[in-house]
């Protein structure tokens, strides 16, 4: 098997990929994400995941590079990572009592410029009706500040969620079924290594 490289600095993606039992290294990508803003959410996360994987793959040989990107969309509005506690509070107030969609694109590229595979997952998440005190308390934990949509379902943010429809791991940031399916296309047998 070629060396597996995760093109992400996300600790959540690192933890999730480790669940597959495959050895991998981490090499975060650096791309200009703004050039993809015009694309609809599913196409955007796929394009960004592929761009991230390609950027890292270009500097490697004999490696499979996994890229990913996640967006939160509510009522047509894309919610990225908040840039301040106040922005996080505004996002959470907006999400309160609503259903939003989490999209994660996943791409695998055979380095340096070999075959590529890309897909995405989509999960609907419904928030509870949140009080201003609940929002303030959650923001005070610091948890929402580095996450798209200003919450982490795998942490205390789970208390904000009334329900989900779809892949939980997608909401965390890496849909493992799609990752396994893409890696299988490149000859990686996750089941044989667990």
UniProtKB/Swiss-Prot annotation:
EC nos: 3.6.1.9
Feature type site, description Important for substrate specificity: 12, 70, 154
A GO term from the CC aspect: cytoplasm
Keyword Hydrolase: yes
Active-site annotation: 69 (proton acceptor)
PANTHER family for the chain: BIFUNCTIONAL DTTP/UTP PYROPHOSPHATASE/METHYLTRANSFERASE PROTEIN-RELATED, BIFUNCTIONAL DTTP_UTP PYROPHOSPHATASE_METHYLTRANSFERASE PROTEIN-RELATED
Similarity comment text for this entry: Belongs to the Maf family. YhdE subfamily.
Name of the protein described by the UniProt record: dTTP/UTP pyrophosphatase
């Amino acid at each position: 098997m070629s060396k597996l490289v995760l093109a992400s600095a996300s600790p959540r993606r690192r933890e999730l990929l480790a669940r597959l039992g495959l050895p991998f290294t981490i090499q975060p990508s650096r791309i200009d994400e703004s050039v993809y803003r015009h694309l609809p959410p599913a196409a955007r996360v796929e394009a960004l995941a592929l761009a991230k994987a390609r950027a890292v793959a270009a500097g490697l040989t004999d490696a499979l590079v996994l890229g990913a990107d996640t967006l939160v969309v509510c009522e047509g509005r894309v919610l990225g990572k908040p840039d301040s506690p106040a922005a996080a509070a505004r996002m959470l107030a907006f999400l309160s009592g609503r259903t939003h969609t989490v999209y994660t694109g996943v791409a695998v590229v055979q380095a340096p410029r070999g075959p590529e595979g890309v897909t995405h997952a989509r999960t609907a998440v419904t928030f509870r009706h949140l009080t201003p005190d609940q929002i303030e308390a959650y923001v005070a934990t610091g948890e929402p500040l580095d996450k798209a949509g200003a919450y982490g379902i795998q942490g205390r943010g789970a208390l904000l969620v009334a329900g989900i429809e779809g892949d939980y791991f997608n909401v965390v940031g890496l849909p493992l079924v799609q990752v396994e399916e893409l890696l299988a296309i490149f000859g990686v047998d996750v089941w044989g290594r667990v």
